[in-house]
Amino acid sequence: MFTVFLLVVLATTGVSFTLDRASDGGNAVAKKSDVTARFNWRCCLIPACRRNHKKFCG
Protein backbone atom coordinates (compact mmCIF):
# COMPACT_ATOMS: atom_id res chain seq x y z
CA MET A 1 0.00 0.00 0.00
CA PHE A 2 2.83 2.38 0.84
CA THR A 3 4.47 1.60 -2.51
CA VAL A 4 1.32 2.61 -4.39
CA PHE A 5 1.11 5.83 -2.37
CA LEU A 6 4.75 6.61 -3.11
CA LEU A 7 4.28 6.00 -6.84
CA VAL A 8 1.25 8.31 -6.94
CA VAL A 9 3.13 11.07 -5.13
CA LEU A 10 6.14 10.79 -7.43
CA ALA A 11 4.00 10.72 -10.57
CA THR A 12 2.03 13.78 -9.44
CA THR A 13 5.20 15.69 -8.62
CA GLY A 14 6.65 14.90 -12.04
CA VAL A 15 3.56 16.15 -13.86
CA SER A 16 3.41 19.30 -11.77
CA PHE A 17 7.09 20.05 -12.38
CA THR A 18 6.70 19.56 -16.14
CA LEU A 19 3.66 21.83 -16.32
CA ASP A 20 5.48 24.53 -14.35
CA ARG A 21 8.39 24.51 -16.78
CA ALA A 22 6.05 24.86 -19.76
CA SER A 23 4.33 27.87 -18.22
CA ASP A 24 7.69 29.56 -17.57
CA GLY A 25 8.45 29.36 -21.27
CA GLY A 26 5.16 31.07 -22.04
CA ASN A 27 5.95 33.84 -19.61
CA ALA A 28 9.32 34.38 -21.26
CA VAL A 29 7.63 34.90 -24.62
CA ALA A 30 5.16 37.34 -23.09
CA LYS A 31 7.96 39.29 -21.41
CA LYS A 32 9.90 39.50 -24.66
CA SER A 33 6.93 40.94 -26.54
CA ASP A 34 6.35 43.43 -23.70
CA VAL A 35 9.96 44.62 -23.91
CA THR A 36 9.63 44.96 -27.67
CA ALA A 37 6.45 47.01 -27.32
CA ARG A 38 8.11 49.34 -24.80
CA PHE A 39 11.10 49.82 -27.11
CA ASN A 40 8.81 50.66 -30.02
CA TRP A 41 6.85 53.18 -27.93
CA ARG A 42 10.01 54.92 -26.69
CA CYS A 43 11.53 54.89 -30.16
CA CYS A 44 8.50 56.68 -31.59
CA LEU A 45 9.03 59.55 -29.14
CA ILE A 46 12.52 60.26 -30.50
CA PRO A 47 12.51 61.89 -33.98
CA ALA A 48 15.73 60.24 -35.20
CA CYS A 49 14.62 56.80 -34.07
CA ARG A 50 11.14 57.37 -35.53
CA ARG A 51 12.70 58.13 -38.94
CA ASN A 52 14.82 54.97 -38.85
CA HIS A 53 11.95 52.71 -37.70
CA LYS A 54 8.91 54.01 -39.59
CA LYS A 55 7.26 50.58 -39.64
CA PHE A 56 6.92 50.65 -35.82
CA CYS A 57 5.60 54.20 -35.53
CA GLY A 58 3.11 54.16 -38.40
UniProtKB/Swiss-Prot annotation:
Keywords: Acetylcholine receptor inhibiting toxin, Amidation, Disulfide bond, G-protein coupled receptor impairing toxin, Neurotoxin, Postsynaptic neurotoxin, Secreted, Signal, Toxin. Changing residue 50 to A: Little loss in inhibition. Residues 45-47 are annotated as: Lacks the Ser-Xaa-Pro motif that is crucial for potent interaction with nAChR. One of its GO terms (cellular component) is host cell postsynaptic membrane. It comes from the Eukaryota. One of its GO terms (molecular function) is acetylcholine receptor inhibitor activity. Coiled coil: none annotated. Residues 1-16 form the signal peptide. Residues 17-38 form a propeptide. Negative results: has no effect on alpha-2 adrenergic receptors (ADRA2). Allosteric inhibitor of alpha-1B adrenergic receptors (ADRA1B). Binds to an allosteric modulatory site on transmembrane helix 6 and 7 at the base of extracellular loop 3 of ADRA1B. Also weakly inhibits alpha-1A (ADRA1A) and alpha-1D (ADRA1D) adrenergic receptors in a competitive manner. Potently inhibits contractions of vas deferens, spleen and aorta in response to noradrenaline. May also inhibits nicotinic acetylcholine receptors with a possible distinct nAChR binding mode from other alpha-conotoxins, due to a different three residue motif (lacks the Ser-Xaa-Pro motif). This is Rho-conotoxin TIA. It comes from Conus tulipa. The lineage of its organism: Eukaryota, Metazoa, Spiralia, Lophotrochozoa, Mollusca.
